[in-house]
Amino acid sequence: MVFDCDGVLVDSEVISVRVDQLVLADLGWELELDEIVERFVGRSEAHFVATVEEQLGLELGEDWDRKYESWYRTAFERELVAVEGIVEALDELRLPHCVASSGTHAKMRRTLGQTGLWHRFEGRIFSATEVANGKPAPDLFLHAAGTLGTAPERCAVVEDSAHGVQAARSAGMHVFAYAGGVTPAERLEGPGTTVFSDMRQLPALIGTGRPSLP
């Protein structure tokens, strides 16, 4: 099982989207929350920066990066918790599992550590910074599977974003799409995808160890 991190393991997407909105407004780009979800949730920080620079016709320097990181860090330290039900789901899981996230290793070390989940995945954590193309390209999921010596068709992915779901499908992996976050269920539905809304449902959906892969 390959788990996304933000919005699947740690309940960070609501926080991130809100901070994104504040940061973008500070730069002069006003976006509604649902627009931010569609454009950026599931994508890498590099994609976010490139999109903002192209949209606003400017180069975001180190000062901006430090300010942005400070806003994120403050919000996460105050509000970040594990996704409801994920601890119970992981306790029942009988499959080898890893994390493959658009976030950086430093970010995952912080968020998984803060929520008490780091030890469950240590040594099996993959970041989009390790591959040429982030989600919705399949590179990250294929990299994780290849590193762990598992064929893509024998893998399943737990995702919460439309971009992540697309990446998993493109990798030839079955997707368990969590609709309990910021992305509406209808944007997650599609072939090879099981949509669910409560993490406590996950073990039963995969048969507590035997996902029904296509």
Residue positions per predicted region:
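Active-site neighborhood of HAD-like aspartate-dependent phosphohydrolases
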Residues: 1-38
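An amphipathic alpha-helix signature
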Residues: 17, 21, 37, 45-50, ...
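Helix-loop "lid/cap" segments that line or gate small-molecule binding pockets
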Residues: 23-24, 44-58, 111, 145
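Short helix-capping segments at alpha-helix termini
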Residues: 26-30, 56-59, 116-120, 149-150
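Short beta->alpha linker loops
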Residues: 40, 44, 67, 81-85, ...
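Metal-dependent phosphoesterase signature
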Residues: 50-88
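Short, acidic loop-to-helix structural element flanking the phosphoryl-transfer center
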Residues: 74-99, 105-109
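Asp-based, Mg2+/Mn2+-dependent phosphohydrolase catalytic module
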Residues: 95, 104-214
